[in-house]
Amino acid sequence: MVKFLSLTSSVTALLLLSLGANGVAAAATTCTVAKSGSDDTAAITKAFSDCKNGGTVVFSKDTTYNLNGILILSDLKNVNIELAGTIKLPGFDKAVKGLKSYIQLIGTNVKVYGGGVINANHSSVSDISIINSPRAHMGVTNATDVLINNITLHTASTSSLRPKNTDALDVSRSSNVVFQNSKLTVGDDCLAINEEVTNVTLSKITCNGGHGFSVGSLGKGGANQHVKTVRIHDSVCNDCQNGVRIKTWPGGKGSVSDIKFNNVELNNVENPILITTHYCDKNQMNYCTNNDKTSLSISDVVISDITGSASNDGNPIVSINCSTSTPCTDFTLSGVKITKASNTPKNVCVNLDGSSKIAECSA
């Protein structure tokens, strides 16, 4: 399932979103969404119902469709969605709070493509872009073979407060996900890989002001969770809170393995390389302290050719802090060339097997 996320009025739009296969599925039936007035929810629902088995749903060019309700479009199979027009979302609606989305597409081999517009929070966005999201922009859940390509996200605060929880992409319970060729301005994770995920590749992404490229958080409340085979490469993070990161909770179970960060440029970043098994919310500190000795196992991690500069927040360039009973293992660091600030302290490697042989741990 791919969620078009919107707690109040954000929505996910993908230049090409693929569930189950590459390319655009062959579709014999075309269902053009009728323009019905101030609320086009029913017309959109009907078009998807009529074309849910091997059809193409068309949002016409130069047409604005008003969505005043929640759309859960299920049982889709081999459906193409041609977004040539504009979808305009409503403002805050309490009914959507529990779902965290205005639009959900549920099915197999569903494609979204075209050069249309989604209007969120009364702001026009084009070329499959999302602006001013009050919550996470995109979510991939219970899906396989997903391609997210050439999108633009821009959510920035108009005050000194950061736009919290505005992740660019959250992935959970999915496999074979590719996110590439995109520009992001967000207030939280540029990528957050959550539980039961295998084979994610992120490349050629520029992220501004976010929390970096993250695996986790994982293991909250003692959960048993797993992430395997993640490739993050040829990307940039500017003015980010974190650069490349793995974060797990104390007391968690499971594993994180086969993770590679390569050729990532981090400019003016607070925590360029941050790996911790001590991630915790402020209101959970007692639990975290009592379960601090164990967490998920983190192994087979390669960090190479990381360049850029550290901010003057006084954090180490490399901070790897693992648990005493579940130390991190099989780490390789090379080509870390981050320019220090005047107050940058020495790097930290705690409970990392083989740290004495890793040059970056003593830098």
From Swiss-Prot:
<feature type="glycosylation site" description="N-linked (GlcNAc...) asparagine">
    <location>
        <position position="199"/>
    </location>
</feature>
<dbReference type="InterPro" id="IPR000743">
    <property type="entry name" value="Glyco_hydro_28"/>
</dbReference>
<feature type="glycosylation site" description="N-linked (GlcNAc...) asparagine">
    <location>
        <position position="121"/>
    </location>
</feature>
<feature type="glycosylation site" description="N-linked (GlcNAc...) asparagine">
    <location>
        <position position="321"/>
    </location>
</feature>
<feature type="repeat" description="PbH1 4">
    <location>
        <begin position="227"/>
        <end position="248"/>
    </location>
</feature>
<keyword id="KW-0325">Glycoprotein</keyword>
<keyword id="KW-0378">Hydrolase</keyword>
<keyword id="KW-0964">Secreted</keyword>
<feature type="repeat" description="PbH1 3">
    <location>
        <begin position="197"/>
        <end position="217"/>
    </location>
</feature>
<dbReference type="InterPro" id="IPR006626">
    <property type="entry name" value="PbH1"/>
</dbReference>
<feature type="active site">
    <location>
        <position position="211"/>
    </location>
</feature>
<feature type="disulfide bond">
    <location>
        <begin position="322"/>
        <end position="328"/>
    </location>
</feature>
<dbReference type="Pfam" id="PF00295">
    <property type="entry name" value="Glyco_hydro_28"/>
</dbReference>
<feature type="disulfide bond">
    <location>
        <begin position="190"/>
        <end position="207"/>
    </location>
</feature>
<dbReference type="GO" id="GO:0047911">
    <property type="term" value="F:galacturan 1,4-alpha-galacturonidase activity"/>
</dbReference>
<feature type="signal peptide">
    <location>
        <begin position="1"/>
        <end position="26"/>
    </location>
</feature>
<comment type="similarity">
    <text>Belongs to the glycosyl hydrolase 28 family.</text>
</comment>
<keyword id="KW-1015">Disulfide bond</keyword>
<dbReference type="GO" id="GO:0046576">
    <property type="term" value="F:rhamnogalacturonan alpha-L-rhamnopyranosyl-(1-&gt;4)-alpha-D-galactopyranosyluronide lyase activity"/>
</dbReference>
<feature type="repeat" description="PbH1 6">
    <location>
        <begin position="328"/>
        <end position="354"/>
    </location>
</feature>
<protein>
    <recommendedName>
        <fullName>Exopolygalacturonase rpg13</fullName>
        <ecNumber>3.2.1.67</ecNumber>
    </recommendedName>
</protein>
<keyword id="KW-0961">Cell wall biogenesis/degradation</keyword>
<dbReference type="InterPro" id="IPR011050">
    <property type="entry name" value="Pectin_lyase_fold/virulence"/>
</dbReference>
<dbReference type="GO" id="GO:0005576">
    <property type="term" value="C:extracellular region"/>
</dbReference>
<dbReference type="InterPro" id="IPR012334">
    <property type="entry name" value="Pectin_lyas_fold"/>
</dbReference>
<feature type="repeat" description="PbH1 2">
    <location>
        <begin position="174"/>
        <end position="195"/>
    </location>
</feature>
<dbReference type="GO" id="GO:0045490">
    <property type="term" value="P:pectin catabolic process"/>
</dbReference>
<dbReference type="GO" id="GO:0071555">
    <property type="term" value="P:cell wall organization"/>
</dbReference>
<feature type="repeat" description="PbH1 1">
    <location>
        <begin position="143"/>
        <end position="173"/>
    </location>
</feature>
<feature type="glycosylation site" description="N-linked (GlcNAc...) asparagine">
    <location>
        <position position="142"/>
    </location>
</feature>
<comment type="function">
    <text>Specific in hydrolyzing the terminal glycosidic bond of polygalacturonic acid and oligogalacturonates. Has no activity towards trigalacturonic acid.</text>
</comment>
<keyword id="KW-0677">Repeat</keyword>
<feature type="repeat" description="PbH1 5">
    <location>
        <begin position="256"/>
        <end position="277"/>
    </location>
</feature>
<dbReference type="GO" id="GO:0004650">
    <property type="term" value="F:polygalacturonase activity"/>
</dbReference>
<keyword id="KW-0732">Signal</keyword>
<keyword id="KW-0326">Glycosidase</keyword>
<feature type="active site" description="Proton donor">
    <location>
        <position position="188"/>
    </location>
</feature>
<feature type="glycosylation site" description="N-linked (GlcNAc...) asparagine">
    <location>
        <position position="150"/>
    </location>
</feature>
